[in-house]
């Protein structure tokens, strides 16, 4: 896999935050002069010039889908994108049980997604014992602030649990 490298933003670049708000408590505030926010939660920050917010939507996926449509891009041209958008709606709306916004309904009905991937994602839950392994490993991690690395020791477990631990570091 290709290693992703952090490149500081310059004046000509754009930082886009999705499903969160730049400067809110759940976002690390990177220095950026051009920031766009795409979110479906209640407004927590001062309004920005590039802000696409709709708290009536059940999912941020719906707002992304609408922005794509407005730009003339049909998400169904890319089945993986359509699947990701659908699964975002699925998870944010309690398995589609809390869909009230007409745009959410339109997206649900119009996306042509890969049902086998959605089924696989729906069935990829962690057991309590696996979550306990991850939790203990994270609580007991050793972090070297000077050199910016962490050492985590976990009990023997499924590689997916190790991946989750790594993602949370």
List each model region and its residues.
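A structured phosphate/pyrophosphate-recognition subdomain
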Residues: 1, 45-168
């Amino acid at each position: 896999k290709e290693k992703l490298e952090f490149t500081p933003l310059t004046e000509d670049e754009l930082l886009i935050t999705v499903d969160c708000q730049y400067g809110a408590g759940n976002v690390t505030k990177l220095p950026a002069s051009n920031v766009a926010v795409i979110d479906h939660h209640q407004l927590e920050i001062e309004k920005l010039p590039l802000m696409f917010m709709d708290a009536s939507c059940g999912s941020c996926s719906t707002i992304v889908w609408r922005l794509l449509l407005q730009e003339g891009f049909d998400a169904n041209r890319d089945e993986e994108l359509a699947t990701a958008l659908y699964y975002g709606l699925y998870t944010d709306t309690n398995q589609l049980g809390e869909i009230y916004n007409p745009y959410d309904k339109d997206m649900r009905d119009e996306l042509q997604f890969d049902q086998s991937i959605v089924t696989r994602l729906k069935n990829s839950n962690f057991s309590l014992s696996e979550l306990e392994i991850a939790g203990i490993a994270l609580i007991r991690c050793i972090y070297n602030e000077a050199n910016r690395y962490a050492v985590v020791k976990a009990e023997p477990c499924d590689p997916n649990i190790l991946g989750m631990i790594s993602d949370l570091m």
